[in-house]
């Protein structure tokens, strides 16, 4: 029993001495590292060993480069943050965030994945009437010659203007110059006209200095004056303007005049 006690005391003293020797060891002294950079015999401190043999400046340089995000990484991080906020409902977005990255659409366009609506300029009013094989062309030319003889026209009437006004004056309803339907039709003609039409109808000096909008407005007012004269002429001479359709007010005027001539006056 006593022998076991002495043995325990001896072991305790031995462990205490070993611990003291370890504490007194200089950890800054160099030692050999066979597997480190430089091969066998390279002297490294413990801290340098943890850096794989790199100097402190090199380690700092690598650490700085690793902490700097590339541009694409920053973009992905920002998108991830936006989607995270949206999923958590923290506010800041009323709709799903859009991608900040540029997308190359050339491949999608070539495959027909993205279609673009192609618009073409509208055809000019009554352009179809001027085809030489159109059976109505002789009648339009006759009306054109009749309208050109109307006194006090603001400018020389074109065939397009004559055909348009010939149709409007025979409308069943709304053929008066002051109606919205007439104004809208004349405005559309002014908007679809080209520079050649403006040069023909307007003062040459005005055309040189005016903008497109100013020329359209001036031409529109000229068309209004022209139609007012056509309207007055046709109601004074319905036989020269009627399209011979039953719905035409001019045709009804002609039929009414014929009825008055055929029927004898009523006497009491």
UniProtKB/Swiss-Prot annotation:
It is found in: Secreted; Host nucleus. Residues 1-21 form the signal peptide. Keywords: Glycoprotein, Host nucleus, Secreted, Signal, Virulence. A motif (RxLR-dEER) lies at residues 48-63. Glycans are attached at residue 104. One of its GO terms (cellular component) is extracellular region. Induction: Expression is up-regulated at later stages of infection. Effector that acts as a broad suppressor of cell death to interrupt plant immunity. Inhibits cell death induced by cell death-inducing proteins, including the PAMP elicitor INF1 from P.infestans. This is Secreted RxLR effector protein 5. The lineage of its organism: Eukaryota, Sar, Stramenopiles, Oomycota, Peronosporales. The gene is RxLR5.
